[in-house]
From Swiss-Prot:
Residues engaged in binding GTP: 17-24, 88-92, 142-145
Family, similarity comment: Belongs to the TRAFAC class translation factor GTPase superfamily. Classic translation factor GTPase family. EF-G/EF-2 subfamily.
PROSITE patterns membership: G_TR_1 (PS00301), G_TR_2 (PS51722)
Gene3D superfamilies registered for this protein in UniProt: 3.30.230.10, 3.30.70.240, Elongation Factor G (Translational Gtpase), domain 3 (3.30.70.870), P-loop containing nucleotide triphosphate hydrolases (3.40.50.300), Translation factors (2.40.30.10)
Keyword Oxidoreductase: no
SS bond partners: none
Coarse class of the protein's main subcellular location: cytoplasm
tr-type G domain segment(s): 8-290
GO molecular function: GTP binding; GTPase activity; guanosine tetraphosphate binding; translation elongation factor activity
Name of the protein in question: Elongation factor G 1
Subcellular location: Cytoplasm
GO biological process terms held by the UniProt record: ribosome disassembly
Lineage, broadest ranks: Bacteria, Pseudomonadati, Pseudomonadota, Betaproteobacteria, Burkholderiales
Length: 703
């Protein structure tokens, strides 16, 4: 099957934004204008095409990044047909894992900002993730029709808060109720969209006289940004020559792809203005798969051996599985991005991470929650596969004859956990299946059984995250469950070095005895270093074959520390000495000796409890600033700064222990009459004050 769209005309883009910047509405309009959707879905009615899980429709927030394919020939039909693969990403902090995961497979992104709210806390998180993966991006200022809308204030915030380098390629005509359209700085014409056709038709008009000076000033800035792309253009510009439209577009495109600038546009998706021009900007400025460096990977058996794959149909096949979803009709769907080569349904692919070959069953092209079966996928495509049993998020799929491991994604450790128990015996079995399915879909969600209580414990990135997963368990799997109170994921570590601590396991009870003896030194590591074991045994005082047993004994003890039974982190153990018995020594005895030595060393090394600290940002009207700050301080929070919001009001940034943040949304609502909002994400672990540590230990019954 021949390629319908040349790869140069592919655009793999993400639409991402803070909650309520209108991202889902913007995506809906894109689907409408590109002719896929014939009736626009409104988030207000719970009918938006991209928000396809029931909870999303009820809550009006986007949870799952649905992947959609659409086609665009330009708003005036003046471009050859381009193929957009659009990934809708969630804007809520509890779902940053989804955003991070989609950034990994995108070539470019459209960042949507609210013209009133401006750069909000989550926008900064998303921006950091886009920087991490080097994703070129456009900025689209939405909701220009709302009271308090201010395009130029958002421009200033992009520069100051995100350290971005925005280059407006349009400026608004009017704002709030008077927002009529935009001045296109490339054409130096006003664009006015026709309301009757929902913005499908438009016309170019002369720039309104009162805007001419503003348009001239911003065009000059845009041309100057373009001229900085190369010395030749700069000479031409400084010599007073006009740059052609094509030169400006190419120069801005080159600088956007190099992540030096971000073209900036505006509109109101809800009123059908401006999104069409943004789609043209996606063609003009964002990269195709061949405009960015080839994807990098490593050899399956040698991490030092670097490999790469070009975005070309004739290369060996390589793809990355970036999302797993359970679909009520076809079962498990694996979304994957093809970086190189091509593959047909029925072909065998190799998963080097799991070291398994699998047959690719059906391949589906997704449009939000509708699907079309296709036979072949090519370089640059994003599709979903049915029938891959072993693949999980972040796995590579490749040609069995040419293995490559594309980089692994690193997922954050969960910070909050809850006990969950089925309401009836019938729910028991279903709950196990449901939790395993959900954990396969979402690497930031973990399930385990508590050995002491026998309870099932679920852990995730925040209260909303777990709430939604429990909700899905009920809807998709019919499991009724009771949820315990949220528990904080504390950790334990040490502050001092404990030298030459011994563990001796001796058992003589008729017949063959047991004998293991290990001496260790335990010392703290810097935060985040994890556990390290060093074998410093000299002269064979412990035989080689027993040393792994000592390490295993220690590793098995790490999940339950001595203070309150929380996992021990960031410690280094050096095995320095020991002894053995020719007859009675065995692996089990040395495992016990290692465990005993470690527990004893922990007691001597000033053990402390660590608690998760959260970066909290509260957006509040100015009148409540004092109240909010006072409340954060009473929660042991440290206020770290304050910013102004575009439409008035303040953003308060603070670091607060997670244990103090339960029920915060209700408290904040009542303290500010529902006018303040907040976001929170995990920052780092810090030592808990003595009184808090004692309270936690008492609650755990381990004083």
């Amino acid at each position: 099957m021949a390629r319908k769209t040349p790869i140069e005309r592919y655009r793999n883009i993400g639409i991402s934004a803070h909650i309520d910047a209108g991202k889902t509405t913007t995506t809906e309009r894109i689907l409408f204008y590109t002719g896929v959707n014939h009736k626009i879905g409104e988030v207000h009615d719970g009918a938006a095409t991209m928000d396809w899980m029931e909870q999303e429709q009820e809550r009006g927030i986007t949870i799952t990044s649905a992947a959609t394919t659409a086609f665009w020939k330009g708003m005036g039909g003046n471009y050859p047909e381009h193929r957009f693969n659009i990934i809708d990403t969630p804007g809520h902090v509890d779902f940053t894992i989804e955003v991070e995961r989609s950034m990994r497979v995108l070539d470019g992104a459209c960042m949507v900002y609210c013209a009133v709210g401006g750069v909000q806390p989550q926008s900064e998180t998303v921006w950091r993730q886009a920087n991490k993966y080097g994703v070129p991006r456009l900025a689209f200022v939405n909701k220009m029709d709302r009271t308090g809308a201010n395009f130029f204030k958002v421009y200033d915030q992009l520069k100051t808060r995100l350290k971005a380098n925005p280059v407006p390629v349009v400026v608004p005509i009017g704002a709030e109720d008077g927002f009529q359209g935009v001045v296109d700085l490339l054409e130096m014409k006003a664009i006015v969209w026709d309301e009757a056709s929902q913005g499908v038709k438009f016309e170019y008009q002369d720039i309104p006289a009162e805007l001419q000076a503003t348009a001239d000033e911003w065009r000059e800035k845009m041309v100057e940004s373009a001229a900085e792309a190369s010395e030749e253009l700069m000479e031409k510009y400084l010599g007073g020559e006009e740059l052609t439209r094509a030169e400006i577009v190419k120069a801005l495109r080159d600088r956007t792809i190099a992540c030096e600038i971000q073209p900036m546009l505006c509109g109101t998706a809800f009123k059908n203005k401006g999104v069409q021009r943004m789609l043209d900007a996606v063609i003009d400025f964002l990269p195709s798969p061949v405009d960015i460096p080839p994807v990098k990977g490593v050899d399956e058996s040698d991490d030092e051996k670097k490999l790469e794959r070009k975005a070309d149909d004739n290369e060996k096949f390589s793809a990355l599985a970036f999302k797993i979803m359970t679909d009520p009709f076809v079962g498990q769907l694996i979304f994957f991005r093809v970086y190189s080569g091509k593959i047909n349904s029925g072909d065998t692919v190799y998963n080097p991470v799991k070291q398994k070959k699998e047959r690719l069953g059906r391949i589906l092209q997704m449009h939000a929650n509708q699907r079309e079966e296709i036979k072949e996928v090519l370089a640059g495509d994003i599709a979903a596969a049915v029938g891959l049993k072993d693949a999980t998020t972040g796995d590579t799929l490749c040609d069995p004859a040419a293995p490559i491991v594309l980089e692994r994604m690193v997922f954050p450790e969960p910070v909050i956990s809850q006990a969950v128990e089925p309401k009836t015996k019938a729910d028991q079995e279903k709950m196990g299946i449901a939790l395993n399915r959900l954990a396969a879909e979402d690497p930031s969600f973990r399930v385990r059984t508590d050995e002491e209580s026998g309870q099932t414990i679920i852990s995730g990135m925040g209260e909303l995250h777990l709430e939604i997963l429990v909700d899905r368990m009920k809807r998709e799997f019919g499991v009724e469950a009771n949820i315990g109170a949220p528990q904080v994921a504390y950790r334990e570590t040490i502050r001092k070095k404990a030298e030459d601590v011994e563990g001796k396991f001796v058992k003589q009870s008729g017949g063959r005895g047991q004998y293991g003896h290990a001496v260790i030194t335990l010392e703290p590591q810097e935060p985040g270093k994890g556990f390290e074991f060093i074998d410093a045994i000299k002269g064979g005082v412990i035989p080689r074959e027993y040393i792994p047993a000592v390490e295993k004994g220690i590793v098995d003890t790490l999940p339950a520390g001595i203070l309150a039974g929380f996992p021990v982190v960031d410690v280094k153990v050096t095995l320095t000495f020991g002894s053995y018995h020719d007859v009675d020594s065995n692996e089990n005895a040395f495992r016990m000796a290692g465990s005993m030595a470690f527990k004893e060393a922990m007691r001597k090394a000033s053990p402390v409890l660590l608690e998760p600290m959260m970066a909290v940002e509260v957006e509040t009207p100015e009148d409540y600033t004092g109240t909010v700050m006072g409340d954060l301080s009473s929660r042991r929070g440290i206020v770290q700064g304050m910013d102004d919001m575009v439409g008035g009001g303040k953003i308060i940034k603070a670091e607060v222990p997670l244990s103090e943040m339960f029920g915060y949304s209700t408290a904040l609502r009542s303290a500010t009459q529902g006018r303040a909002t907040y976001t929170m994400e995990f920052k780092h672990y810090a030592e808990a004050p003595k009184n808090i540590a004692e309270a936690v230990m008492t609650a755990k019954g381990k004083q």
